[in-house]
Amino acid sequence: MDYPFKTVPYAHQITALKKSWSQENYAYFMEMGTGKSKVLIDNMSMLYDKGKINGALIIAPKGVYRNWERQEIPIHLPNHIEDFTVAWTPTPNKIQKEMLESIIKDPKDLTLDIFLMNVEALHTTKGARFAERFLNGHRALLVIDESTTIKNPKAIRTKNALKLSTLAKYRRILTGSPVTKDPIDLFSQCEFLDPAILGHSSYYSFKNRYTIQVKTNVGTHIFNKVVGYKNLDELSGLLEPHSYRVLKTDCLDLPEKVYTKRQVDLTDEQKKAYTEMKAYALTMFDNGEVLTASTVMTQLLRLHQISCGHLIMESGETKIFKNNRITELMDILEEAVGEGGTQFISGKVIIWANYRQDIRTIYDTIKTKYGSEAVATYYGDTPDSERQDIVLKFQDPESPLRFFVGNQQTAGYGITLTAASTVVYYSNNYDLEKRIQSEDRAHRIGQKNTVTYIDLIAEKTVDERIVKALRNKINIASTVMGEEFKQWLT
């Protein structure tokens, strides 16, 4: 394909672009780790170069949308394209407000305007109206990243997304798993692209065509319960001209490891606790107290715990903070497990957590959604007699055990977990060796796929510095002292 790409595309990405680049409506159903963000950026660039668009509105989940600004666009947008990229914020400061107004009021054909918005903003009148203003002022490409976020036709965000779709000539949806529970999930996603794709203007007529329903009584309430599906070959045929589906197993030229991250915002409660703890640590430094390695690590540990959603007090009690990290994890799992939710799960996932409290929270949340057989924990409290059985079940493709929740110190050595090609670091350990060893539980002999590593990161906290240090192969425990400790705090 003759185009001045900034980063060289893989074969499957070229295929996706050839099929889609000039189409008005298209779905990239590409498994996590196959590079759908790059495909979208290249597609956007091609449309801009041909004079088809002068703006793009990319809507993504809260933990993802700023990755486009800080990572995906700078890495993949071709060098010859001048862009003006602005990210939505509901409470902008003076500079942010000026940038937001500028991208609305002053579109230029010599600059590609890229507006990034979190999908949750579509639940608000303010966010939806601003998105509408952007689209009305541009020849635009409208994108929903992780499009299962608009699968519920009754949700306000979905209704607003569908209204916005009529204002953009070009529309794209991106997701690794277009079907998270049942084929009905496709209706709103496809309606966003073009209602004509499925040939059903009504959600209920679509549901009747592709589901088997039986009349069910619960007390005095009578409703039709979905017990199965039908005409799925027909549904696949309708989607085929408008979508590209690829799995990591289909991509022979992918690198062995792919790293990505999800941003997690601190709640107000966490911000308050974090600010107070940081001030205390800085006071220790400024007062000239002798900072031993143990003292430094204790302060970093407390700040990291707060960013993860809890704090172990000096009394030994654990204070729990309301936090967004577990919500972001569950969003990732919904995409990673593949089509069909608990019935047709195609993937297994390793989740590493540094703290007991994190492991308990993760286990309880996954158990509630997917059932007790779908998740197991492997950490200090796990009896030795159960550990080998957990590994064997996880490695068994027929076993219902899909989620391995472990601590890097306990489970990061000596065991094989190649049944998973998705690894999530809910909270990291400071030790570089433990990070390397835990990565290699999935990336070792027997692994047939590219392994995707996802770090959950609380922005502008020690959490962010920990991940950066580990990715740069820096052992935090032996290097963060003195002035560097102060830099980590500020």
Describe the function of each predicted region.
Residues M1, T34-G35, V39-K52, P61, ...:
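Conserved Helicase C-terminal RecA-like lobe
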Residues M1-F29:
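Conserved pre-motif I regulatory segment
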Residues M32-G33, A168-P183, E191:
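Conserved helicase ATPase motor motifs in RecA-like P-loop NTPase domains
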Residues V39, K52-I75, T180-D185, N354-R356:
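Conserved Walker A/P-loop ATP-binding site and its immediately adjacent core
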Residues V64-N93, L193-A196, K369-S372:
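Conserved helix-turn-beta segment of the N-terminal RecA-like "Helicase ATP-binding" lobe
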Residues E101, L116-A121, R129-N136, A155-K169, ...:
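Inter-lobe coupling linker of SF2 helicases/translocases
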Residues H123-T125, K181-P183, I359-Y363, Q388, ...:
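SF2 helicase motor core recognition
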Residues Y430-T490:
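A conserved SF2-helicase RecA2
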